Amino acid sequence: MFRVLNDDVYSPAEIQQQNPLAFGKASSLFTDNRSANDQCETGENVRESGQDHVKRPMNAFIVWSRERRRKVALENPKMQNSEISKQLGYEWKRLTDAEKRPFFEEAQRLLAVHRDKYPGYKYRPRRKRKRQQKLLPADSSKLCKQMHIETLQPFTYRDGCANTTGSRMESQLSLSQSVTITNSFFQNEHHSSWTNLGHNRVTLATQISADFPFYQSLQPELSCAYFQY
């Protein structure tokens, strides 16, 4: 079966000589596929998306605006469709009832034809599909907004601002340096005062111990009174 269908190896004449029945099946298979491809290309037996959709009958304004829209578009080729629609609505409101009457009559005639052609017609408006938006968590969304604002609105320095910023930075730097120097000075003074105080205490104790025999030679009541605390 696979040898029969392989056209690259065997020609149609060889296939017919080897197995005429298989050639008939293969040819019918090729013709069926070709007809199916033709149907796909021409759109036969394929249900189109708008095949079942029936248009609404035109009202008086649409009947009037069809021809008027073409004229306005030809007169103003650069005008957008939305602007043309606004102009047509304004012009339609300015028309009198006598001027609108022929278009209402034409709309009634088209409505009667539409009822005869589609007796069970009911207007069914198409529903608009709602797009699902994936929302980020609150914290991450706020962070993204902040990052977006920072990237879109960078801070630009001007000459005056740069000078002011530089002077502020220099003043802050000098202030921090002065505070550091003052702190180091107080620390050194505090350390030196404690060192001097300790040294004075040692000197005083040494001097008292050296002079102790002299105080003992004095009267006992004076020596005791001197060393009472």
Swiss-Prot record:
GO biological process, one term: male sex determination
Function of the protein: Transcriptional regulator that controls a genetic switch in male development. It is necessary and sufficient for initiating male sex determination by directing the development of supporting cell precursors (pre-Sertoli cells) as Sertoli rather than granulosa cells. Involved in different aspects of gene regulation including promoter activation or repression. Binds to the DNA consensus sequence 5'-[AT]AACAA[AT]-3'. SRY HMG box recognizes DNA by partial intercalation in the minor groove and promotes DNA bending. Also involved in pre-mRNA splicing.
Similarity comment: Belongs to the SRY family.
Record-linked InterPro entries: HMG_box_dom (IPR009071), HMG_box_dom_sf (IPR036910), SRY (IPR017253), SRY-related_HMG-box_TF-like (IPR050140)
Chief subcellular location: nucleus
Name of the featured protein: Sex-determining region Y protein
Species this chain originates from: Przewalskium albirostris (Thorold's deer)
Listed GO MF terms: calmodulin binding; DNA-binding transcription activator activity, RNA polymerase II-specific; RNA polymerase II cis-regulatory region sequence-specific DNA binding
GO cellular component: cytoplasm; nuclear speck; nucleus
Alphabetically ordered keywords of this record: Activator, Calmodulin-binding, Cytoplasm, Differentiation, DNA-binding, Nucleus, Repressor, Sexual differentiation, Transcription, Transcription regulation
Subunit text: Interacts with CALM, EP300, HDAC3, KPNB1, ZNF208 isoform KRAB-O, PARP1, SLC9A3R2 and WT1. The interaction with EP300 modulates its DNA-binding activity. The interaction with KPNB1 is sensitive to dissociation by Ran in the GTP-bound form. Interaction with PARP1 impaired its DNA-binding activity.
Subcellular location, record wording: Nucleus speckle; Cytoplasm; Nucleus
DNA-binding region(s), chain positions: 54-122
Highest rank taxon of the organism: Eukaryota
